[in-house]
Every structure is written in structure tokens, then in C-alpha cells.
Amino acid sequence: MTHPKELPLAQLQFYATAPYPCSYLADRMARSQVATPSHLINAETYSGLVAAGFRRSGMFTYRPYCDGCQCCVPLRVPVNDFAPSRSQRRAWKQHQGLQARVMRLCFVPEHYALYLRYQNRRHAGGGMDEDSVDQYTQFLLQSRVNSRLVEFREPGIGDQPGALRIVSILDVLNDGLSAVYTFYEPDPACSYGTYNVMWQIAQARELGLPYLYLGYWIEASAKMAYKSLFQPHEMLLGGTWQRQPAR
């Protein structure tokens, strides 16, 4: 794992949190290494942090720092080499009618309602299904880096907007896009999550950026293991990004 002192981040300080219950693996305790102060973490600095395995949650920039556990593995997709599977191509084709709108970070009641539906159906009992407006805003709508909100809708009729299907938060980095969080209409048959990752890959290509950073892959967590289905991909192992063989 890259040490923070090896990064051009001399003004930042890093501290380890106290242990807390792991969100992904039952009966495990987790710790995080946090980069501070947050007001010094601009788009340039954050790009270096993401390349070193950090992620962002609101103003909170962190990476796993767990005792005796290295299950969280940063994963990124080299977008120009991406080769979709048959099921991924099917999901892409299924939702070609969706219309993407790139927006600044802002609170939209319809987005928040979709977020709560998604959490209640996909992650019920995890705590986020009861997030208040303030918690939602702090988690997704606060940023000091180059962030975008993208909403995906069905085609509208006249002046009426179409049905909202997906909302995604992205950070634009020096060398790629970073997928912060995505939520969508919780219909398992629709493969909205797969479609959205493929849209992000296509968007990175369009912007001339080589990578899509998907966050942490956790093999033992169904919520996180899907990321390795996007191939080829690279994982940050021992401080070096390494291309992984096809599974």
C-alpha cells in the first residue's frame, strides 16, 4: 500500500480512526485512515489520493486501515480496453432510451425519494434506509473536488419530464472518473447498475480519461464483488496497480 508520505501531499495529515463495525463483512471490525484537513483536498490532490487507494464520502477522504484484514481492494477499469460480457451488452442495449443529464451537485426532492426507495429495497436495515435530508446531503452533495450529479430518465412527453430511473455521483480526476455512489429504481430485472457503470465507462472515453475508478472490490461481499465483472480491470495490490487475469 502506498504510504501517504510518498505522495505530493506534504501539507496533509493522516490519522487512523477507532475501530467500528464493518459495513460489508458481518462480525468484523473496521478502521479507516483519514486525510485531513479537508479544505486542502482539492481536485488535484484528490486525484493523487484516489490513485493511492483513497475514496470520498462527502468531505471525508479515507481508505481502509483495518487490523489484520486486507479484503477491501481498490479496483479500476482501463476504459479503452473494456470488453463487455454478453449480459453487460444486453443491459446496455436495454436502456439505450434513457436520457442522461449532467448537473451540479444539488438537492432534488425526487432524487431523495428515489434514494430512500433504493435503500429500503436493496439495503434495508443497514441504517441508510432511514437517512434524513441532512444525512443524504452530507453524504452525496458536499464536495470540494470536481463532482457531477447525473440523472437518467425515460423520455418525457411534451414539457413533462420522463420517469427518473438512476442518479449517479461522479468525481472527475486527472486520470479518470471516480464513481462515488449510484442509486436507482430497485427493479432487479432492469440491470440499472450494470447499465450505469457502462455509461460511466463510455463517458470516461468521451472525456479522454483512461480509467474508471469503481472503489473497493470485496470478494466476500455480494454488494461489492460485482465490480470484478467489468473486465479487464486493475487492482491496487502492494501499492501497485496490477492488471488481473480474466475470471
From Swiss-Prot:
Keywords: Acyltransferase, Cytoplasm, Transferase. One of its GO terms (cellular component) is cytoplasm. One of its GO terms (molecular function) is arginyl-tRNA--protein transferase activity. Its main location: cytoplasm. Its EC number is 2.3.2.29. It catalyses: N-terminal L-glutamyl-[protein] + L-leucyl-tRNA(Leu) = N-terminal L-leucyl-L-glutamyl-[protein] + tRNA(Leu) + H(+); N-terminal L-aspartyl-[protein] + L-leucyl-tRNA(Leu) = N-terminal L-leucyl-L-aspartyl-[protein] + tRNA(Leu) + H(+). One of its GO terms (biological process) is ubiquitin-dependent protein catabolic process via the N-end rule pathway. InterPro entries: Acyl_CoA_acyltransferase, Asp_Glu_LeuTrfase, N-end_Aminoacyl_Trfase, N-end_Aminoacyl_Trfase_C, N-end_Aminoacyl_Trfase_N. The keyword Transferase applies. It is found in: Cytoplasm. The keyword Acyltransferase applies. Pfam families: ATE_C (PF04377), ATE_N (PF04376). Belongs to the R-transferase family. Bpt subfamily. PANTHER family: ARGININE-TRNA-PROTEIN TRANSFERASE 1, ARGINYL-TRNA--PROTEIN TRANSFERASE 1. HAMAP family: Bpt. Functions in the N-end rule pathway of protein degradation where it conjugates Leu from its aminoacyl-tRNA to the N-termini of proteins containing an N-terminal aspartate or glutamate. This is Aspartate/glutamate leucyltransferase.
